[in-house]
Amino acid sequence: MNWPDYSLEEAALRSGARFVAGVDEVGRGPLAGPVTAAAVILDAGCIPEGLNDSKKLTAKRREALAELVMARCDWAVGHASVEEIDRLNILRASHLAMCRAIAGLRQRPCLVLVDGNMLPRDLDLPGQAVVGGDARCLSIAAASILAKLLRDRIMVDLAQQHPGYGWEANAGYPTPAHRQALLDLGVTPYHRRSFAPVHKILCKEETATR
């Protein structure tokens, strides 16, 4: 298995950057819930061992690493709501969540390493897009772990308010069971109306009431 490393952060620090943040988001694909981003500035002297892309970790390992990151590092989380996703589109909402996470850091980064191939439009700091960053860069890997864990917790809470959709297990992603629940139970306030499977159901409901 290839592991992320600290080389991008080290290069920036050698070039004079004082603080380098890694940023990642989770929740672009779900039919329900917010999109969540995290920003992390690692302390080079005490980087938690075992950081990796959150998708490659078990839930137990993810939680243990998240606790270490939150205890040792400067970190923050940002969200964009379902309403913002529907109004802006999912890409812009993801970037909004990233900017909110960066703004929540105690220290202002000199450089932001962003997972993906595009920097947020409203980023007011120097940034570098890193394709596959959660598997390449330790700061981004740490951010991916926090974003995943904290969004999953939100979806567990929402599942208690709206049982039957399986959000505690599927985190709002379009599993067959979630799609069937949409047909059987209908659309909740936490479903993304701009996403095709939800939009189609709403259109059918509107047609049926005419």
From Swiss-Prot:
Cofactor: binding details: Manganese or magnesium. Binds 1 divalent metal ion per monomer in the absence of substrate. May bind a second metal ion after substrate binding.
InterPro entries from the UniProt entry: RNase_HII (IPR022898), RNase_HII/HIII (IPR001352), RNase_HII/HIII_dom (IPR024567), RNaseH-like_sf (IPR012337), RNaseH_sf (IPR036397)
Example of a GO cellular component annotation carried by this entry: ribonuclease H2 complex
Catalytic activity: Endonucleolytic cleavage to 5'-phosphomonoester
Pfam families: RNase_HII (PF01351)
EC number: 3.1.26.4
Record GO terms (molecular function): manganese ion binding; RNA binding; RNA-DNA hybrid ribonuclease activity
Gene Ontology biological-process entries: DNA replication, removal of RNA primer; mismatch repair
Principal subcellular localization: cytoplasm
UniProt entry keywords in alphabetical sequence: Cytoplasm, Endonuclease, Hydrolase, Manganese, Metal-binding, Nuclease
Positions contributing to a divalent metal cation binding: 24-25, 115
Cofactor(s) listed: Mn(2+); Mg(2+)
Localization: Cytoplasm
Stored NCBIfam families: PRK00015.1-3
Functional note: Endonuclease that specifically degrades the RNA of RNA-DNA hybrids.
Stored HAMAP family: RNase_HII_B (MF_00052_B)
Protein name as catalogued: Ribonuclease HII
